[in-house]
């Protein structure tokens, strides 16, 4: 009986005794920066708001979005996401930078040497890389470089991005272990490298066949000037769109890669929350990922307009 009473009290505390529609409205109210709350000291401490004006026993306030507390740990979801998100963003950024550094030059050289051995090699590798899921790449890299070749590479199969320094002036402080970023970034970047290589190659071959490129050749422009000044800026439009889309998609791929390497980021946090039915953490992670997708797509449109002057006109 005491357990039933405690369960009822907990349901009331979490608002689970209300109808589902009411729960949704209160959750949206908690998320909104401009919201309606009771002017009670406990509410002020909970929501950390700034009061605008009062409406009886209620007040309209400005506050940061309140993502509630974890069912499992009791900590604020915003604090948990605040520790996990930077690690995942760093991982996704490292993967997409690696993809750009490898994919764009490889696509350019493959297009300039069409039907050569380099072109065939680039097409074969990109097709193979695109067909491999991120978690398969992660397992293979962990097995080969983190296990079998560990003595030569010094890389770990499983390792957190941060840890305590064991020597030096920052002894005992939390520091970034950069070598633990390498394998997850490579595993996450395999498919973006493949798609960027294919898109760059196709776009460059299309641009190089345009009339204005033939005119540039007829005027005696050097091959380097023609490629880097005239062809490449126009060929980068679809590549920029792909990069922006893949950056957001890498957050989803990170869910699998982080668990393979025990990388304590957003993906690992979300998977653990799903396994433990920690709904507030799952909702917070989903909302953040959705916001990133929207923000990245807006940024892609801006970059597309900057690169392609025709769009600006």
What are these regions (language model features)?
Residues 1-29, 39-46, 149-174:
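Hydrophobic alpha-helical transmembrane segments of membrane transport/permease proteins
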Residues 1-19, 78-83, 100, 109, ...:
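N-terminal signal-anchor/first transmembrane alpha helix
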Residues 5, 19, 23-26, 62, ...:
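Generic alpha-helical secondary structure signal
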Residues 16-101:
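An internal, D/E-rich "acidic patch" concept
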Residues 85-90, 94-118, 134, 147-150, ...:
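Alpha-helical transmembrane segments of integral membrane proteins
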Residues 135-140:
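A gly/Pro-rich, aromatic-decorated transmembrane alpha-helix motif that marks the paired
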Residues 142-146:
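Transmembrane alpha-helix termini and helix-breaking/packing motifs in multi-pass membrane transporters
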